[in-house]
């Protein structure tokens, strides 16, 4: 009887360990694609901003988004690999856009969902090409925003 009880306990431990191994394997296979780079041969965010300049689009100062005053307090998800803030002086002080470069679709979707979830009155233009997200101030006209989108499409 005692031997039978030990045998059942051992079997329960073995089943528990097997369940744990299967669970860990499932978690690994589910998260692995999110960790692998989705895109290759992406331009840097500064390359995209320079392409705007080269094509004659209005671009004032540009700098890494981390140098933007108050960036750390902004609720924009920080899932990007690198990003550049650029100003468009005709839109007013501190108005312009940002170019974000992402490693995975999941990280890109997090930022795109944030911007697209903003109230319509302040929702910026958001364009995506090859893992690069362009966010433009909503004060700009649709036709002007389209010019930046076209350069992004040609560059990324």
Residues of each region from the PLM?
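Soluble, non-membrane globular domain cores that form compact, hydrophobic packing
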Residues: 1-96, 102-156
């Amino acid at each position: 009887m005692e031997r039978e009880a030990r045998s059942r306990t051992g079997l329960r431990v073995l089943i528990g360990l097997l369940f744990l191994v299967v669970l860990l394997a499932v978690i690994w296979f589910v998260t692995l694609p999110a960790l692998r780079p989705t895109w290759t041969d992406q331009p840097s965010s500064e390359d995209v901003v320079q392409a705007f300049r080269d094509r004659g689009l209005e671009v004032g100062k540009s700098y890494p988004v981390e140098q933007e005053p108050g960036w750390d307090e902004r609720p924009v998800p920080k899932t990007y690999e690198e990003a550049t803030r650029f100003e468009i002086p005709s839109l007013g002080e501190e108005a312009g856009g940002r170019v974000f470069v992402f490693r995975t679709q999941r990280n890109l979707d997090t930022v795109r969902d944030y911007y697209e979830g903003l109230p319509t009155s302040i929702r910026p233009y958001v364009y995506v090409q090859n893992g690069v997200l362009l966010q433009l101030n909503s004060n700009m006209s649709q036709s002007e925003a389209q010019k930046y989108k076209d350069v992004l499409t040609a560059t990324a």
